[in-house]
């Protein structure tokens, strides 16, 4: 039986062998295909592993500036790859490292890897910039760090990556879009957008290859068709179709979805060169700021008069019903420790009115920046800018102001109309965040309601502010209260009720870009390595003082020496700029504030902008007694058109190559910010400056100077009155 089965089996296989060979070819092909699949799968798995190792190794590069940065960096170890976008600092899983001195920003939920890459101390071989004889290595290293950061940000970045142009907004970037300004849910929408991006989507992003500006692009300019016309502020004005049926301005900053590529028109009656400083303190050209509601406002107030073609500002007529100098002296009499221009150098003034307070302090070497509230439909902030006073426009509602913690020596509110005790006191807690320990909060008002007074007293007591004085100034008839923030954390432990509570240790007090306000108290810095732990030196000594918490002192000193030499040898004499007509200046990529510091002796003020994706050096800029602000240049800036006489951009475009959808929109924004007759000075790679020059020519700017050496260059251009 067994023998028969064996014979049958042999016969069966013999028949199979005689069948066509096609089936064997197919089986062989399937086996080979399977082996190829296994090979490629193992290859891809290896690549992913290598990528992870490479990202984790960035921690070796990071070098925090202060211990505040260091401790927060440790907290951020648990951050996830899929976390991105604009952060709510209250969430432990979303909050990253503190940005005390100059580590990378943590305004958004970025990963620890990004923190490491964007640090300025990473070095690699790149062409050495030689635009001038004096070259600073810090500038190179900062640029290299930004380049490395951009490379990685496309794989992990959220709204600051390659699709970072105004994600917060709702219109189409031309003033024609559809808007549903549901302001109460703005921050919720931001979170939803952040969650939509998966790990797979992030990993698909790659570094943009090729030039920053599209060489094939042809620009056909047109005027913006917006509700606010010649005063268009893209992220503040509500210009969508639906928005026009609602409020005039957004409750919170909300930018167009698409890059703004239209040009803001000139005022209805044209624009003439502004009155030069210091004459502009007392008068400006009315046509440059003409506004229907401003015309009605002028008729009701005596501190501003229409005199022919000018608006004049009588020195003896102020909102203080008397001499503002008396008001300042009254404050010093109540609190002798306040020494204007010495221990008090940097002041934030809430709201814009007649700017007499700002002007009087300027004469005492006090630099005051005014917060023009978005509800100011009279546009008094624009009047202040035209007069030459530091001003920016923002809402004061639910998001933090774009400043680091503990940087203002004094905050002033004179009849500013802010209800500090409302919404759980979060507005006052925001002032507590940005006020320097031991700093002063001055509150002046004409009519105090008993209910408001009681609520304010309870709130200030709950956050342990000490009321130093409460008197009525006779000349102005204003009740003046002066509070002082604690200098240590001991007093917080003595509170019977821990409400508001102390903020969590992992919450970053310096995170400010699209970050909601918190109803908690941040602890006072106590270690010498933390920024804000000690009061700065008196002015002007603080300008050249490098605090203990600054770990890159040598680089900061090199930066200062570099820009002093550059400004004195080139900028003041070699560019053809008439500095007698320059007052409002912006440094679009401030590092240590060296460029602004070099202009201190000139009759100018400088807004030092620290991009939110770059190392956070803004606390040090304030420590020096200079002004600054956080900003993302993929979005329009928070100010009126024609605000600045000079824009300075040092390697701005090369650092934003992989962050902004359309870098040309930054040039459009520069055109919006600059006054006719104003200047831009751009230092960057030659491959960037050449197409940039063509874009400026298409905007009918006058190219006054170009300079190139090796791969680096400089471009100096002046804006004209041309509009399409």
Swiss-Prot record:
Pfam families: Methyltransf_29
Glycosylation-annotated residues: 305, 316, 568
The enzyme's E.C. designation: 2.1.1.-
Listed Basic residues bias regions: 107-125
Membrane topology: Single-pass type II membrane protein
Side Lumenal, residues: 44-724
Top-level EC class: transferase
Amino acid composition bias (Acidic residues), ranges on this chain: 141-173
Homology family: Belongs to the methyltransferase superfamily.
Identification of the protein by name: Probable methyltransferase PMT28
């Amino acid at each position: 039986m067994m023998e028969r089965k064996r014979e049958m089996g042999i016969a069966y296989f013999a028949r199979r062998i005689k069948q066509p060979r096609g089936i064997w070819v197919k089986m062989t092909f399937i086996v080979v295909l399977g082996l190829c699949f296994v090979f490629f799968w193992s290859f891809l798995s290896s690549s992913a592993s290598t990528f992870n190792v490479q990202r984790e190794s960035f921690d070796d590069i990071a070098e925090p500036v202060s211990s505040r940065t260091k401790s927060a960096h440790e907290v951020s170890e648990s951050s996830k790859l899929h976390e991105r976008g604009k952060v709510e600092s209250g969430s432990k899983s979303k909050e990253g490292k503190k940005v005390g001195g100059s580590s990378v920003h943590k305004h958004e939920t970025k990963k620890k890897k990004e923190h490491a890459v964007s640090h300025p101390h990473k070095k690699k071989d790149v062409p050495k910039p030689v635009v001038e004889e004096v070259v600073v290595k810090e500038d190179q290293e900062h640029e290299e760090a930004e380049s490395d950061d951009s490379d990685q940000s496309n794989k992990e970045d959220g709204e600051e990556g390659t699709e970072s142009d105004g994600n917060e907004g709702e219109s189409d970037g031309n003033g024609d879009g559809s808007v549903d300004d549901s302001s109460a849910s703005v921050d919720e929408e931001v979170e939803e957008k952040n969650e939509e991006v998966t790990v797979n989507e992030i990993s698909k992003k790659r570094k943009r290859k090729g030039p920053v500006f599209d060489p094939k692009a042809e620009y056909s300019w047109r005027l913006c068709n917006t509700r606010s016309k010649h005063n268009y502020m893209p992220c503040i004005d509500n210009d969508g179709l639906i928005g026009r049926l609602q409020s005039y301005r957004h409750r919170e900053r909300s930018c167009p979805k698409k890059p703004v590529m239209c040009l803001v028109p000139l005022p209805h009656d044209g624009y003439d060169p502004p009155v030069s400083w210091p004459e502009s303190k007392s008068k400006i050209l009315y046509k440059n700021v003409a506004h229907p509601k401003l015309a009605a406002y002028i008729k009701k107030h005596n501190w501003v008069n229409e005199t022919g073609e000018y608006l004049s500002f009588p020195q003896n007529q102020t909102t203080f019903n008397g001499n503002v100098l008396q008001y300042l002296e009254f404050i010093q009499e109540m609190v002798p420790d306040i020494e204007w221009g010495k221990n008090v150098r940097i002041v934030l003034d809430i709201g814009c009115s007649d700017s007499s307070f700002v002007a009087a302090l300027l004469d005492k070497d006090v630099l005051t920046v005014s917060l023009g509230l978005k509800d100011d439909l009279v546009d008094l902030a624009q009047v202040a800018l035209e007069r030459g006073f530091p001003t920016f426009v923002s809402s004061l509602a639910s998001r933090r102001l774009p400043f680091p913690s503990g940087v203002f020596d004094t905050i002033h509110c004179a009849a500013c109309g802010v209800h500090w005790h409302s919404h759980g006191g979060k507005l006052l807690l925001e002032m507590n965040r940005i006020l320097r320990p031991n700093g002063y909060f001055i509150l002046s008002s004409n009519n105090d309601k008993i209910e408001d007074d009681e609520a304010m007293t309870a709130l200030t007591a709950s956050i342990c502010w000490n009321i130093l004085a409460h008197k009525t100034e006779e000349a102005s008839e204003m009740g003046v209260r002066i509070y002082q923030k604690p200098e240590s954390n001991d007093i917080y432990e003595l509170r019977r009720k821990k409400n508001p509570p102390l903020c969590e240790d992992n919450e970053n007090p310096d995170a400010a870009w699209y970050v909601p306000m918190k109803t908690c108290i941040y602890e006072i810095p106590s270690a010498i390595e933390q920024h804000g732990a000690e009061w700065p030196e008196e002015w002007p000594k603080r300008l050249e003082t490098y605090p203990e918490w600054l770990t890159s002192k040598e680089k900061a000193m090199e930066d200062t020496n570099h820009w002093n030499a550059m400004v004195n040898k080139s900028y003041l004499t070699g560019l053809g700029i008439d500095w007698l007509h320059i007052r409002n200046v912006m440094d679009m990529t401030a590092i240590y504030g060296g460029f602004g510091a070099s202009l201190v002796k000139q009759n100018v003020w400088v807004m030092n902008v620290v991009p939110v994706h770059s190392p956070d050096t803004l606390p040090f800029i304030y420590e020096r007694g200079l002004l600054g602000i956080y900003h993302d240049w993929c979005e329009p800036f928070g100010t009126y058109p024609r605000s600045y006489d000079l824009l300075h951009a040092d390697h701005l475009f090369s650092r934003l190559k992989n962050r902004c959808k359309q870098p040309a929109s930054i040039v459009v924004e520069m055109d919006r910010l600059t006054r006719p007759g104003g200047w831009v000075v751009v230092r960057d790679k030659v491959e960037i400056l050449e197409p940039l020059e063509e874009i400026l020519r298409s905007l009918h700017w006058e190219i006054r100077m170009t300079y190139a050496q090796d791969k680096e260059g400089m471009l100096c251009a002046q804006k004209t009155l041309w509009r399409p």
